[in-house]
From Swiss-Prot:
GO cellular component term of the entry, any: cytoplasm
UniProt-listed InterPro entries: Alpha/beta_knot_MTases (IPR029028), RlmH-like (IPR003742), tRNA_m1G_MTases_N (IPR029026)
Record-linked Gene3D superfamilies: 3.40.1280.10
Organism: Streptococcus pyogenes serotype M1
GO molecular function: rRNA (pseudouridine-N3-)-methyltransferase activity
This protein's name: Ribosomal RNA large subunit methyltransferase H
């Protein structure tokens, strides 16, 4: 199984890079994990609605190029479905049973995701109503993916 994490913007903070790197190492026992960082568009301070739509559209084009035709896509969006870690684990396990070999997670830029990406997604997922920095969300999501595999294995990691 392959797990891809497509992110808009570059990860800058060293502590986040270190945390993600640790979970990438741990995940290598279960899957091929790949994090793809895409260039984000600069948003002007007083951007209009049209400016924001154009920015999201440009980012969506970059994202779309990295999604495989047969990928099971989970896009992170505030309006997405929320569920506990156990259900998330079942979801990941179930994707392979449905014949998918790649799960692709998408974290958008500071403006969120364009509707074209949300429509392409097989599922929209939310970690709640809190707003988290997109770079921190990468670490949280990577840990949850690892936790999902550990739950499937019956590991005491998840208590």
């Amino acid at each position: 199984m392959k797990v891809k994490l497509i992110c808009v913007g570059k990860l800058k903070e060293r502590y986040l890079k270190d945390g993600i790197s640790e979970y990438q190492k741990r995940l290598s026992r279960f899957c091929q994990f790949e994090m793809i960082e895409l260039t984000d568009e600069r948003t002007p301070d007083k951007a209009s609605f049209a400016d924001n739509q154009l920015i999201m559209s440009k980012e969506a084009q970059r994202i779309h190029k990295k999604i495989g035709e047969r990928d099971f896509v989970i896009a992170l969006a505030i309006e997405g479905k929320q569920f506990p870690s156990e259900t998330f684990s079942e979801l990941i396990s179930g994707v392979t049973v449905k014949g998918y070999s790649t799960i692709t997670f998408i974290i958008g830029g500071s403006l969120g995701l364009d509707s074209i990406i949300k429509k392409r997604a097989n599922m929209l997922m939310s970690f709640g109503l809190l707003t988290l920095p997109h770079q921190l969300m990468r670490l949280v999501l990577t840990e949850q993916i690892y936790r999902a595999f550990m739950i499937t294995q019956g590991s005491p990691y998840h208590k």
